[in-house]
Structure formats: structure tokens, C-alpha cells
Curated annotation (Swiss-Prot):
Stretches forming WD repeats: 353-393, 415-454, 460-501, 504-545, 548-591, 595-634, 639-678, 699-745, 755-794, 822-860, 863-903, 906-945, 999-1038, 1052-1091
Domain notes: The N-terminal TOPLESS domain (TPD) (1-209) binds directly to a 12-amino acid LxLxL EAR motif peptide.
Function field: Transcriptional corepressor. Activates TIR-NB-LRR R protein-mediated immune responses through repression of negative regulators such as CNGC2/DND1. Negative regulator of jasmonate responses.
Domain LisH: 4-36
Chief localization: nucleus
Entry protein name: Topless-related protein 1
Secretion signal, residue range per the UniProt entry: none
Organ and tissue specificity: Highly expressed in stamen primordium, microsporocyte, ovule primordium and megasporocyte during sporogenesis.
Miscellaneous remark of the record: Overexpression of TPR1 leads to constitutive activation of defense responses.
Pfam families named among the record's database cross-references: LisH_TPL, TPR1-like_2nd, WD40, zf_topless
Assembly description: Tetramer. Interacts with SNC1 (via TIR domain) and HDA19. Interacts with SPL (via EAR motif). Interacts with SPEAR3/TIE1. Binds to and corepresses GAF1/IDD2.
Amino acid sequence: MSSLSRELVFLILQFLDEEKFKETVHKLEQESGFFFNMKYFEDEVHNGNWDEVEKYLSGFTKVDDNRYSMKIFFEIRKQKYLEALDRHDRPKAVDILVKDLKVFSTFNEELFKEITQLLTLENFRENEQLSKYGDTKSARAIMLVELKKLIEANPLFRDKLQFPTLRTSRLRTLINQSLNWQHQLCKNPRPNPDIKTLFVDHSCRLPNDARAPSPVNNPLLGSLPKAEGFPPLGAHGPFQPTPSPVPTPLAGWMSSPSSVPHPAVSGGPIALGAPSIQAALKHPRTPPSNSAVDYPSGDSDHVSKRTRPMGISDEVSLGVNMLPMTFPGQAHGHNQTFKAPDDLPKTVARTLSQGSSPMSMDFHPIKQTLLLVGTNVGDIGLWEVGSRERLVQKTFKVWDLSKCSMPLQAALVKEPVVSVNRVIWSPDGSLFGVAYSRHIVQLYSYHGGEDMRQHLEIDAHVGGVNDIAFSTPNKQLCVTTCGDDKTIKVWDAATGVKRYTFEGHEAPVYSICPHYKENIQFIFSTALDGKIKAWLYDNMGSRVDYEAPGRWCTTMAYSADGTRLFSCGTSKDGESFIVEWNESEGAVKRTYQGFHKRSLGVVQFDTTKNRYLAAGDDFSIKFWDMDTIQLLTAIDADGGLQASPRIRFNKEGSLLAVSANDNMIKVMANSDGLRLLHTVENLSSESSKPAINSIPMVERPASVVSIPGMNGDSRNMVDVKPVITEESNDKSKVWKLTEVGEPSQCRSLRLPENMRVTKISRLIFTNSGNAILALASNAIHLLWKWQRNDRNATGKATASLPPQQWQPASGILMTNDVAETNPEEAVPCFALSKNDSYVMSASGGKISLFNMMTFKTMATFMPPPPAATFLAFHPQDNNIIAIGMDDSTIQIYNVRVDEVKSKLKGHSKRITGLAFSNVLNVLVSSGADAQLCVWNTDGWEKQKSKVLQIPQGRSTSSLSDTRVQFHQDQVHFLVVHETQLAIYETTKLECMKQWPVRESAAPITHATFSCDSQLIYTSFMDATICVFSSANLRLRCRVNPSAYLPASLSNSNVHPLVIAAHPQESNMFAVGLSDGGVHIFEPLESEGKWGVAPPPENGSASAVTATPSVGASASDQPQR
């Protein structure tokens, strides 16, 4: 917005204030973000109108803009929370804690725990730091003093706290001056003109005209009472301009049955919703010649009104009665020099020689180190980046020339050199598509390793195929293409049948971006004349016609979560633009700064982590924070990059592939990426090829994957410490199973017992790794904690030192409701929150929510029948719980609204296992009916089901439990049944490996993955504990009962009922026994591991591999 337009807003604000449109004044202040009315803010705080306070603030800043903003929102929400506690309105306080204060836990988890702890106090003033808290009125006044300091110090409020000095009724004066000037231009000026409208210019009419003007020098709209107006607080300073909305709304565009023409306006609005699949980056290429079109540069009128400076000035101290809040990286007394965040991939980890110049790259959506490359001579390559191995290299070849059109055959004869314009994987990685510069699209099916098979060849367009993307209209996987023939076409990905053709562009179509919002699916397309169009799958024409910044080569992409839309374009003059679109308002929200004045090629961009943008420009990779228009940092990758390098992130943002000179590809990595590559490299050095019937290798970076455990829990692992051991490859040595038969051959510890219980039904290590929680068959919970001391500096669980059985000073126990059920018949289940503060549990009665610090019961819900038998949190929303029931149903329950959202029916007996995959967006369930079901978490529809394969000759008890737990790759899962261990692939629900229990052997009681998914710890009815290699389900170590049970119990039928793996130490596990005891196990320090992996079958190792810091088996709240 220009400075004059900004000043006009101030004039309107003054006019509204004078006319006493009070609510409208403050609404315009908020929406424009030009003037922060401190007096109005103070009044709303004093009155406790917290919703209005936050709504008003939202026009100027957001919670995560900077530390000042974060503290402002924190103090407001904390005050609202304390007032609810002071009124003894516990439900409201809990609601504020979950909805408003939870966001701060990621910055200061200890503080959030302390705030949560206030719920357990009768009077929160018992907290030492809040002991001076007075009444509500005085507390608000004290807080307001601190808020004013924070606002005045916040750079986002700079130049917004003073209203410009204006004469009274300045807008009226300007209009009257204009009317006087108009009257002077009248050809027949009348002495007493009558001004009846401002909608058209004034002109005195002849005497025979019907209109009778009034004196022009009368005040506008007559003499009206004047308000006091805004105080003259001094001149305003400079302000960053904002994007101006375009008068071409797209409201209702989806309801129009035919093409609706719109005027082409620079930076026009794109009012569309959020997608399901992130649009991929586009490659630069040489498009056909088009006439040049002028377009505003990045420093013109497309800049956000909210700039976020990197430098932060002095901190403001907090009041004595405030809980102090500090955040990472906080500096005192000095401005900070910004440093590139550690989660950006900045280290050159791999350099790959492709052989020809890369034009397009795409990482596999699940196998995070698998990179697909297309080059300028039509080659495609498939790289395992971790091992630096090129798995596949294919040159361009038409599969069936006889089926090609004559124009294509003629084009290939005239110019046989064909370039790859785009490569892209399907959402599940089972297919990939290649778009070529000559007519052709080829689809390959991928089956792991080097197994790449021809699937479909489509003669798609006349001329080049410029882009290709996958979409799922009507839940049918399709391939969408665009080309030089100015069309967009949609093809059935299974058969190659053309479903739709979209025509309407007047220039070659450069890129496409499929997208869906709710149940409406559509496609964005951009052409080389700068036009952006949107299409529904209905052959009814374009719904949108706007112009993109740069008016030439433009691509569009969404953030990974589909909530934010970006476009990147380069003009024919080399000016490049990245902008974010405000879909709800239909305007350019912000234009990012930092491009070279004249880019030396078409700039390519990508997004990652719902936070960063990256683009290849000026022989470097440039990064932006999505919320800040200024350049975050630029990296040259040790030099040697192309002028406008092609770039591509892997799905989790831990790796970034960048094209370089001399046909090279550089792969950048952050710390997670380096660990991922290191693990893959170590594993590949042990075996070069996967075993027969092995599971394809799938890696996931450490920071995002949560592994659902056998106890219905899924833990987000960030500090797992895998032990990458050097297994012997000496073929001359004979492998021997490791047997542990004496207490001296391992480290084991029976945890001390303050009370006797009959048997342990469920067992969990806490997420922090310093405690164990057990649920006994009598519905009582037991908690052991290790203390930090000289002998245990970390305070983590260890078999070398006994923990303390912990209980609060009140002496109360966490005891589940048992209703009228027989404890022996009840099925206990529980789930632990990721911050270890709460446990949700049931033992045949109501489900209870306990505070782990005080052992108090916070809530109970869902009384039987039916009774809960398994609990699992949804990986994207901690308020959604999947609850398995004893009536064979699965209830999808929303804790916040206390409502069952869906009821899933597919089993015939009680539910015994649930596990979520946040990669495949599915829920896998298992039941006492030995059946496995896969449910889609989007609509909770059953996708597949299969009855467990019971080994031949084995009988099974009528209510035998079947447990499921996802491997760290989130694609394969472990099935545990008394007759077997099995590994299944989820998408096909196919058994990949099975280890059956011999007919004469003791049945399995429980099993779980180690935290890195490399091992499977398994307990048996005869008290034996076995350790298997998860890659091939081969036994590597056996712990006999004599190693941990005293001789007096050797013939007493005492055995493990449940087993749990430590969340960070991959060689530590614990078992819960049928006599109520809990044992923890570790290998001897001299050994460091449980046995040696058996030699690979048929001379090769299986390829289910682990990543360095992912996994778990026993906690329940994954990160959202």
C-alpha cells in the first residue's frame, strides 16, 4: 500500500472517531495494523475481555513472531488461566491450558509443567512464585505495566503507537477543498450550489435543470457534533507498504458452471483453499518466445505490512509475581545477530556424479534417502544417497514407437535429443512419472531396490510435456500433465485412459498444482503469458484468470500441511519473485526479498517443515522463514553450483538435493540427515543386496517419527541412542547363538517393591527415560524413578542402580475404576502423555485420566459397557483417541468435546491392539479374533482386512491377544501372537516375514521393537526372553530364566506377561512378571549388545533397516 493510501486510512480513522463509530474504529485499527490504540488495549485488559484483547493484538503480531510477542501472549493467557483457577472454574482452566498455553510447552516445557501443576493446588498462591498474587483487579494492573513495556520494546509495534498530528476533521476539510475546486471549474457557477452527493463530481446545472444545489462552502454533510478525536501524539515514522486487494473477488468461483472471465490484474487474488499434496518444485527451462510484460519488482507494492526484523533489542524484565518465561536463544542487553537455524540442511554430505546435467529431482515420499533424477539428455537415475549407490540408470527410449503419433515420430527423427522436464513420485512411492520435452510421459512402477518396471507410456501433448503431477479425483489415482499445446490433461494412472482435457490457456502451460479443499478437488495451472487458472474436474472451463508476478515462468506450491500457498516466478528480464498468497482475502500476502537483481535462469523453489522456503539463485541456495520477507540465509554448498540450481527437499526436510556444475548433485544435510545417511551407509556396508522375501529398506529421520507401542502408545523419539555395532563379516567364523544363563552374564535388576501386587499387566518406560510405570491386575499403578546422583549423572534408567518406588506426599494411589468387573477378566490398558505428566488408563471400568505428579484423578469418562481394552492417541491430534472396546468396536473419541466421532466395526471379538502410521495416514487394528484391519484415518473407512496366518499344526486359545506395533519406517508393522512373530507391509497387508513358535514350545506372551527397531524383544510362557534381529526375524540371543529368576521361583510358573523397550537406549528393556515383579535388563558393559546378528540367509542380509534416532514401544502421545 502506498504512503498516501496509508495516510487515507488515518484520515478515515479520525473521521470514524469523530462520528463516534467506536467499534468500527478499533476494527479498522486491527485490520490495517497501522495504529495500535494503547488506551483501548488497556481498557480491554482492565475489563478482562481476553478474546477481544487477543483479537486486537492479532492485527499487529502473532504468537511466534518474536520473543516479545510470545511473552505478550503468554502473560495474557497465563492471567486468564490464573483467574479461572481463582474462580475455582477447573474445567475452564483446563480448557485454557490445552487450547492457549500448550503452544508454549515447546519453548519451555518445565514452565508448562509447573503451570499444569497449579491445577492440583487448592490455591495456586501456594506456589512460591505466585504467593504475592493479589486480587484480580490489581493483578491485571500489574500485568498491564509489563505488557506496555513489552509492546513498546517490540520492533513490530515501532511507529504504530503514535497517531499522526492532524487538524480536526481533516478528511472533511479535504473534501470541502475538492468541492470548492470543482465548483470553480463549473461553466455556469451558481452562487448557492446545493451539494447532495459525493458519488459524482460536482457541476452546477442550468436554471431549467431539476437539481437545486446548496452552498458549496457549507461543511460536508452539514454541521455535525464533533468528538474529541485522536490525541495529537506526534508525526508518524516510515512504514512498510502492504499488498492492496484487487477488486476481483473469487467468492463463489466453485459454484459457477462455466468459464468466468476476470480482468487480469498484477498480483491478483487467488482465493482457494488448502491442498492434500504439496505441489513440487519446477525446473527452469527455455520456454517459447513471448512478448515482454512489465510487472512490479519485489520491492514495490507487494510487501507484507508486518515485517519481522531479525535483530531483537533489549529484553524487558517481568514482575515479581509473574512466573518467569525464558526461551531458547534469549539474549540480554544486546541485539542478536541472526544465525541460520540448525534444522536447515547446510552441510554437504554427499556429492553424486550423474553423468548429464540434472533437470529435475524428487526424493521418495517414504524412503527418505532415495533420490530420483531426470537429466537434459533424457536419462533417469535412481540413487540411494546414503550408500552413494546409483541403483538404476536408464536412457530415453520410446517403448512402443508403433503406438506413437506421427507428429511425435517426426519430431524424434528431426531432433532425437530429448530432455527430462520433470520427475515425480506418486504419494505412496509405488509409481513415478517422467515428463519429457517431446510429447511423451512415461510411468514406472517401483518395487524396491533396483526393481523398476515399465507401467504406462502416454503420447500426452503435441510438443513438450512441461509438468506432471499425481492427484486423486474421486479417490482414483490420476496423472495430470500440461504442455506446449496449451492444454492440461488428466489420465487414469492404472490404465492410461484420458479422463479430462482442460483448454483455455493462450500460451504453453508451464506448471500445474493439483489441490483439494474439503471435498472439492481442482488444479492450478500457470502459462508462459503469466496467466494463472484454476480448473475443477468437470470440463466446464477455467474458474480463475489472473496474472502471476513476473508474468512468465511461474510455479506454485503449498506448505507441507497444505495451509499456505506460495508461487515462484521469473520474468523474461530475469526478475524473480516468491510470494505468499492470502487465500481467504484473495491477495498477495507478502513478497520475499533477497533475489539477485537479474537472475541468470529460471529460479526454482521448494518448501519444507511448514516453515522454510528455499530457492536456487545467484550460484547459491537462499532460505527464507515463511513469516519473514527478509532473506534468512544463503549457502553456496562449498561452491560449484549452477547459476540457478535445481533444488529438492526430502519429505522431512533433513536432506536437500542441489544441482551443481559438471553434472554433479550435492546433497545437503542437517544433523538428522547426517545421522540418517550414516546409518544407511553402515548398514549398506554389511550387505549389498536385500535377502529373498526381505522387506524393502525404508528410512525416516529422527525428529518426526513416532512409533506406536504394544501398550497402545506412540512415542516421539528425539534422543534415541542406537548402538551401531560392527558385526563380524568373517565367513571363517562359525556363528553361535548367544545364551545368557547366569546372572553374571548380563545386568539385570528386580525393582524394589513397597507393596505387593499379583501380576503386572502393562509396562511403560516414561518418555524421559528416567522412570518405569506399571499397571497391575488389581488396577493399581506403580511408578519407579531413577534419581540423578554421583553414580548416575544422567538420572536415566539403568540396571546398575535401583530406582525408588515413587509416591506423592499425600500417599494416594493411582487406581483405576473397576466397576463390577472381575479383575481377572478385565483387560487393562493405558497410554502415557509425551511430557510424562498424564496417564490415561482403564481396567475394565471407566477410563481415568491421572496426574503423574500428584497421582490425582483429573477425569473419568466412558463407563462400560462396552469396556475399553486398548488406547492409542492420534499422531496428529492429541485430543483424538482410538479406543478399542470389548464389544469388538473401535471408537474414535474427541476428548476436548467429549464426543465419539466415529465407531469402526470390522472385528468379531475384543480389540487387542491399535497402531497409527502418520506416514500412511492409517490405523491398524488387531483383535482376539486374530484379524488385522487397516483403516484410513481421513474418513475412517476400512481399507483392508486379513486373518492372521496361524502356523500349521498350532491351535490357539479362543481369546488369544494379537498385538501390532509399527516399525520405525511407519510402513511395516510387527504382529505378535502367542503362536508367532510376523512382519507385515501395510499398504498390501502382506506378510513379509514370519517366525512361528514350534508346536511343542511355550507360547509367546509379549514382544516389542527396540527403540531403533533393529531388535525385537520377546517373552515366553516358560520365562525365556529372546532377542531377534528385526531385519530377518532370526534369533540372536536367548536369556534363560536362570539368569534373572531365583532358584526358589524356577518351578513356580513365574513368567513375563509384558515387555517394554527403553525409549533411547536400544539395548535396554524391562519385563513385568506374573508374580507382580518388574525386571530391567541390559547387556554387560563389556559386550554392549545382545549377541551377534546371525549370518544372512543365502549370503545376503535382509533390508529392514533402522534409523539412528527413531522408535519406541511404550508411550502414547506423538508430537502433533
